[in-house]
């Protein structure tokens, strides 16, 4: 592994913590985050990494860096970023090509975990493995009947498992679109995070935009980390 040495860190804060009610940087929250990570660490009989610098960035929004650079939206155009993770929903509106942030929204109780729980419950009823890993894999492969026949022990309940997952996905999509009704007038929508593909259909139905104006960012679960790494490399 990597030997203990001086390191600089890039970390993130949820949008509702990074920005204040006026969509300005919340310098107090950012300062606390930096100070917390720059505290000296002492290990008993061991060497520790020394944090020399901490850069704090907002979650979600940086995932759109590369795509907005390709599209080059005008200063009057707005882009809604919807970031759906396991337990949280973050969203923000970018003006132009990161000229400004006009709105942010966060809800720490909306996430893919509600679909995972539904899948695990259905798998349990089908006498099958119910770990989060298996449940998430079943969700991703819910339309692959051959795969489901291999992992669901009670084959007679395969359709019931699929129906429970579909119901949970529909419910999640409805909750996300309800949370974000105030942002229907944007010019485009980008979806990121592990739940992006699950809510894509619901977003397309709820936003009155041309199909090419709504996108799931490539490899959405890794998009934020990838774009932050690219940003730091160029910085």
Task: Name the predicted role of every residue range.
Residues 126-148:
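Conserved, helical-rich catalytic subdomain that frames metal- and/or nucleotide-binding sites
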Residues 1-81, 98-112, 142-189, 193-235:
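Nucleotide/phosphate-binding catalytic cleft detector across ATP-hydrolyzing
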Residues 92-132:
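Glycine-rich phosphate-binding loop plus the immediately following alpha-helix
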Residues 84-90:
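Ser/Thr-glycine-rich phosphate-binding loops at phosphate-binding pockets of nucleotides
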Residues 65-66, 90-92:
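Short helix/loop capping segments that flank catalytic or ligand/cofactor-binding pockets
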